[in-house]
Regions:
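Long, hydrophobic alpha-helical segments that serve as membrane-spanning/inserting helices
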Residues: 1-19, 30, 34, 55-56, ...
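Alpha-helical transmembrane segments and their membrane-interface boundaries
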Residues: 1-120, 125-162, 332-490, 498-517, ...
Length: 708
């Protein structure tokens, strides 16, 4: 058994990743030093950097396939640069065609998008060192050697820790779930201003992050499930993922209007007790995340039982004081929902629960990977027009790199290819992301050069500079996903140190700054004027997709109220799509906040629509969380009509507005006249239908403003 301290570092993926980078860079600096040819350090180190930036999680056979594709792409890109470099016009043509081709390959999936970026990166690295070697094949082979060395270390790590990346993704899913539950608990703050929509907005953004993490976990699971479904570790991981999905559905559900809840129970301890329960469940998800990372059993907190007992007693006191029956029913449903989350967490380690027989469709995951040549052709054809954001980015990126290359040819800059390198890293598919990276890139470069010059003077020895190359390289990878400005500073130091091996460290400092400014300027001009991807223009289309996904989610829930509860694949796909589209809408609205052409009125409308759509999804999620077979014909008929009317209201033409309004009013009247069985889920169904209907008038009004 490992001690807790040793286990903490042995199973710490960040530490293991940094250790792998350290070993790789030690190899690329120690070998040239031993051979007495310090110049070899440059292509070997850059090969390691490119390989590390294109590292992809997969099972062993998938990693080997990725390695072959990556090395082939790297060699083609690097050799093409060497062979075409003497002929500027052919080089410009090759740069344009290869940039568009590589980026469009990203339409086949994340694997190909990552490899394509690496190929473009290795091409620019080749440009930086094109004068280092006499023969065209020398630098490409050395870059490939660096990439092979890093991938050998990666494969070794995979053999030792084969499912570690999957466990990391699972742990992140529960960590994001904990964050979502904590934000959800703030809605139960009795002192919250009724006009303040910020907590709901933060909740919608957190939901987007959680959905993205769950999708990443699903992709990681899929790579390991093929032919491996019967293993105990696979069943366990799949069980954890399904529990996370179920908790997400329950956590995102809403059983009551929070403003009404605060108005009725502002001076009662009920609000605080619900808030505390959600906070405790958030802490439980954090503890589960740590248990997954450290591979230790999760211990459920025994205080939950006491918290539920005291909340029951508080609700009994409120009920005895004469609170409205409708409010008490809603709180009862909310309490049952929290009990279900608690039951999931309490039994997640149970072998009996994990081994329960499920139908084949309940264990399936939706596979979005490529299936055959027809699928490849279909995916590529979808991105062959200006309607595709990927196509626009491919054309924009090719023009950016060609503009940088033309500037180099016209001015004769000796180290001008850093312009292309800067543009490649800074130019993102949308304005907001580019603007953010642009500022951080400039700051990081300026600080890196300011620190680098005295370091070159203070550490003149070869051995000292090789050690600093290793240290700055490790720090670059340690910071690249958490603080881009710091990462840029360290990669700038690494570049200065590498070129100082050629005696050019002081010479390249000022060009590095100038080239960074030029590259950032070209990238900014491109995203601002070449098919600018303003998110406010996408709002109508994204809103329509979110509305459609909610309607399909409702359809899937309706089917289960007729046929009985299960977790079949079709239901989970509908649920995932609804949350994906809600996350997409949150991303668009968030990006709109910094775009220059958005009016304050449009920004406010988009913000309100995001809050309303997330609330609608939460009301639908509550129906899904409590789904079970109903037998009362009147309730089922009402539910059928409600689903149809909601769909009709969200898709109607302006000329049909009166008809839709009358239908919804009639539905509200039918809800008031029905008497559901109190010992079933019928009261909850009626309650959730009423909550959904209450949102539709404002959603339709704002929807009309956006579409007009």
């Amino acid at each position: 058994m490992l001690s807790p301290l040793l286990r903490r570092y042995t199973w710490n993926s960040t530490w293991l990743y940094n250790a792998r980078i350290f070993i790789a860079l030690v190899g690329t600096t120690a070998l040239p030093w031993w051979l007495g040819d310090a110049k070899l350090t440059i292509p070997l180190t850059l090969g390691v950097v490119a390989a590390a930036l294109t590292d992809l999680d997969d099972r062993l056979t998938g990693r080997l396939r990725n390695l072959v594709i990556t090395l082939f792409s790297f060699f083609i890109a690097s050799a093409s640069v060497e062979l075409l470099f003497p002929w500027p016009w052919l080089f410009a043509l090759g740069l344009t065609v290869s940039t568009i081709s590589f980026i469009l390959l990203g339409g086949l999936g994340q694997r190909y998008a990552t490899i394509a970026f690496g190929a473009l990166l290795i091409a620019i690295y080749t440009m930086l060192g094109v004068s280092l070697y006499a023969h065209w094949y020398q630098q490409p082979l050395l870059l490939i050697a660096g990439a092979v060395w890093y991938n050998l270390l990666t494969l070794t790590g995979h053999l030792i820790f084969p499912i570690r990346p999957l466990q990391d993704n699972l742990a992140r899913s529960y960590e994001q779930l904990a964050h979502y539950l904590e934000l959800k608990s703030r809605l139960f703050d009795p002192d919250l201003d009724d006009e303040n929509q910020a907590p709901l907005y933060e909740l919608a953004l957190a939901n987007g992050q959680l959905v993205a993490t769950l999708n990443q976990t699903k992709a990681s699971l899929l790579t390991r499930l093929r032919g491996d479904r019967g293993q105990r570790s696979t069943r366990r991981t799949l069980h954890y993922y399904f529990v996370a999905q179920d908790i997400h559905e329950r956590a995102s559900s809403s059983h009551i209007q929070y403003q009404a809840l605060r108005d009725h129970f502002r001076y009662s301890d009920v609000m605080f007790r619900f808030q505390r329960l959600l906070s405790m469940q958030s802490l439980a998800c954090q503890a589960l995340s740590r248990a997954i990372l450290l591979r230790t059993p999760y211990q459920h907190d025994a205080r939950f039982e006491r918290a539920f007992t005291h909340l029951d007693a508080a609700l009994d006191r409120v009920r005895a004081s004469g609170a409205a029956p409708e409010q008490m029913k809603a709180l009862g449903f909310l309490l049952n929902n929290l009990r279900a989350i608690d039951a999931q967490l309490a039994t997640i380690e149970s072998e009996q629960v994990q081994s329960q027989a499920k139908s084949e469709t309940e264990n399936l995951l939706a596979d979005d990977s490529i299936h055959g040549f027809d699928d490849i052709r279909s995916r590529l054809s979808r991105n062959m027009s200006p309607e595709s954001a990927l196509f626009r980015h491919a054309v924009r990126m090719s023009l950016v790199l060609c503009a940088g290359y033309a500037f180099i040819q016209l001015t004769g800059l000796q180290h001008g290819y850093w312009i292309l390198l800067t543009s490649l890293f800074v130019c993102q598919p949308n304005y907001n992301a580019t603007r953010h990276r642009l500022a951080l890139r400039i700051i990081g470069t300026l600080v890196g050069v300011a620190l680098g010059l005295p370091i070159l003077w203070l550490v003149p020895s070869l051995e000292g500079q090789l050690m600093l190359i290793v240290i700055t390289g490790v720090l670059f990878f340690a910071f690249r996903n958490v603080q881009y400005a710091h990462a840029t500073m360290f990669i700038t130091l690494l570049v200065l140190l590498c070129f100082n091996l050629l005696g050019e460290g002081f010479e390249v400092a000022l060009p590095r700054v100038i080239d960074t400014l030029i590259g950032c300027g070209i990238a900014w001009i491109a995203v601002s004027f070449i098919w600018p991807d303003w998110k406010f223009r996408n709002l109508p289309r994204v809103l329509e997709r979110a509305v459609n996904a909610n309607c399909r989610y409702l359809d899937a829930i309706l089917e289960q109220y007729h046929q009985g509860r299960d977790n079949r694949l079709a239901y989970r796909i509908a649920r995932r799509d609804a949350h994906n589209r809600d996350a997409e809408l949150a991303s668009v609205v968030s990006n709109m906040s910094t775009e220059p052409n958005v009016t304050a009125e449009m920004r406010e409308t988009a913000f309100r629509l995001l809050c309303l759509n997330h609330t609608l999804t939460s009301y639908i999620s509550a129906l899904g969380a409590h789904r079970e077979k109903l037998t009362t014909p009147e309730i089922l008929a009402l539910l059928d009509d409600a689903v149809c009317y909601v769909d009709d209201a969200l898709h109607h033409l302006p000329s049909d507005e009166d008809r839709v309004s009358q239908a919804l009013n009639g539905l509200s009247a039918r809800i008031n006249h029905l008497e559901p069985r109190q010992d079933s889920k019928e009261p909850l169904v009626l309650q959730q239908i009423g909550l959904m209907i209450s949102l539709l008038p404002e959603i339709c009004r704002l929807q009309k403003q956006v579409l007009s």
